[in-house]
Amino acid sequence: MICFIPTKGRLNTKTYKLFEEAGIEVKHFIEPKEFDLYEVPNKINIQKDNQGISYVRNFMLQYAKENNHQWIIMCDDDINSFYEYRNGKNIKVGADVWINIFQKANQLPFELYGINNKQLIWTAKQDYVINKASVEACILMNVNKIDWNYSKDTKEDKDFALKTIKEGNGIVKFLKIGFSTPTVGSNKGGLHEKYKDKQDYKWAEKMTKKWHPYTKLYKTNKKVDVKINYKAFAKSLNKIIK
């Protein structure tokens, strides 16, 4: 198992240190224009600038296959900690929590394994769900089982989750383990400018049409997003649901 971190505009990223402390190897995937600016270990040049997050995710998948990395953790560059909900409390833990997840995943048939947002782990009624939710920000992937790619200009992680349910066995999400990051779109770098420019609104609309009738566009004063009924989608395909 190895951790892949795509990074852009965040020269001070420290996410890799969480994994180093847990003894998990890390590689950073960086655009050519910023490659020499980063002082992080194990840098990989992704060959093209400004191609978006789907491009780099697909680049990492291909890199993993070409270099015989069956299990990868694909982790955002602004993850700053991990937590577990135990005995009524959020307990800060190390990235070695992914070693525990891997040991379980290695015995299971699914392609994607993810965790919750720290802010939500206290609400979990069960330890995990299967094919009822998407996973994002930090994901364990069984690359050997994946022969589909990320789509461009969409809610790429949710879209990839639906593809995984459709084309593969699906997704396990551990609800009482969580990651912590800055507020989405508030941390300069990454997709920050696209969030500011409201591109995510267009992506939500596009995805709603693509995956109808299992999607619904919803609007609040602050955002437009897509609500997805993963359970109904999985059920329509006779996939495992738990």
Report residues per predicted region.
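A short acidic (Asp/Glu
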Residues: 14-16, 38-39, 83-86, 123-129, ...
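Active-site-proximal specificity loops/subdomain of glycosyltransferases
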Residues: 29-75, 80-93
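Short, solvent-exposed loop/turn segments at secondary-structure junctions
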Residues: 9-10, 34-35, 78-80, 118-121, ...
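Short, well-formed alpha-helical segments that are part of the catalytic scaffolds
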Residues: 2-24, 34-38
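Conserved catalytic core of nucleotide-sugar-dependent glycosyltransferases
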Residues: 82-163
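Structural motif
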Residues: 1-2, 71
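A structural signal for short, well-ordered beta-strand segments and their strand-loop junctions
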Residues: 28, 71-75, 111-116, 171-175, ...
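C-terminal catalytic/acceptor-binding lobe
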Residues: 1, 7-11, 152, 158-242
